[in-house]
């Protein structure tokens, strides 16, 4: 069993709302079809969700009726993205089953909780890849809040205990001087980040959150990598149990 989290930046251009690049998805789907291993697929929202969520101020929960319109529009945009990905994967022979994130996840002050694992387990038993995405879900204290695909990957790992989790991005892994700059860090431990912003590794914002979830997964005993979605050579090597020519492995 493998969990693959496809970052929104790997398949959309966040500077252009509702933009979608399906070519990387096609290449990945062909590889996954050929390798034939059990999967769970999770994707981010990218330019489909982020502009709407930002415009309606959903990052800190919901406080008024205007924001509830933002919840509606964000979930609709994410389902449109999911539908496009589902169709493209099916064309390449990868069967997925869409599980609406809000039907299985809840949150408390923005912290994800897998409240109803049944649909995920049932899909896996039937041999189809569950597909989820980062989304706006009901929050016991904030009304609605956003949970990331990375948080979902951590919780589903806790449920299924896969042998491998891949975070696929628009860059080849974590770099010593920020996105695409400096040396590619082939292995990364939590302690390597003590000097963030100084002379060690410069990671901030969304990547820092992604790393936190990735390390939590690695500490469960699951090998965890960050790779470019376009680096099919490395992805195939990792799935085959070999060392990839690129990518960053998270070490607990």
Regions found by a protein language model. Give the residues of each.
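C-terminal catalytic "cap/lid" subdomain
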Residues: 2-252
């Amino acid at each position: 069993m493998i969990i693959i989290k496809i970052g929104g930046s790997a398949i959309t251009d966040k500077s252009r709302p509702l933009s979608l690049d399906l070519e990387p998805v096609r290449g990945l789907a062909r590889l996954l079809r050929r390798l034939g291993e059990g999967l769970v697929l999770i994707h981010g929202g990218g330019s489909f969700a982020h502009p709407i969520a930002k415009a309606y101020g959903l990052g800190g929960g919901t406080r008024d009726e205007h924001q509830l319109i933002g919840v509606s529009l964000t979930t609709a945009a994410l389902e449109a993205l999911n539908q496009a990905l589902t169709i493209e994967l099916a064309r390449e022979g990868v069967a997925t089953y869409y599980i609406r994130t809000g039907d299985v996840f809840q949150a408390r002050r923005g912290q994800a909780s897998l409240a109803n694992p049944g649909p995920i387990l049932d899909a896996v038993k039937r041999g189809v890849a569950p597909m989820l995405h980062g989304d706006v879900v009901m929050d016991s204290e904030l009304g609605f809040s956003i949970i990331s695909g990375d948080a979902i990957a951590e919780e589903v790992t806790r449920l299924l205990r896969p042998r491998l989790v891949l975070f696929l991005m628009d860059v080849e892994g974590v770099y010593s001087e920020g996105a695409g700059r400096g040396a590619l860090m082939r292995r990364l431990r939590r302690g390597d980040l003590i000097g963030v912003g100084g002379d060690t590794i410069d990671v901030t914002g969304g990547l820092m959150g992604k790393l936190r979830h990735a390390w939590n997964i690695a500490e469960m005993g699951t090998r965890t990598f960050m790779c470019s979605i376009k680096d099919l050579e490395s992805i195939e090597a990792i799935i085959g149990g070999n060392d990839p020519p690129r990518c960053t492995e998270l070490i607990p």
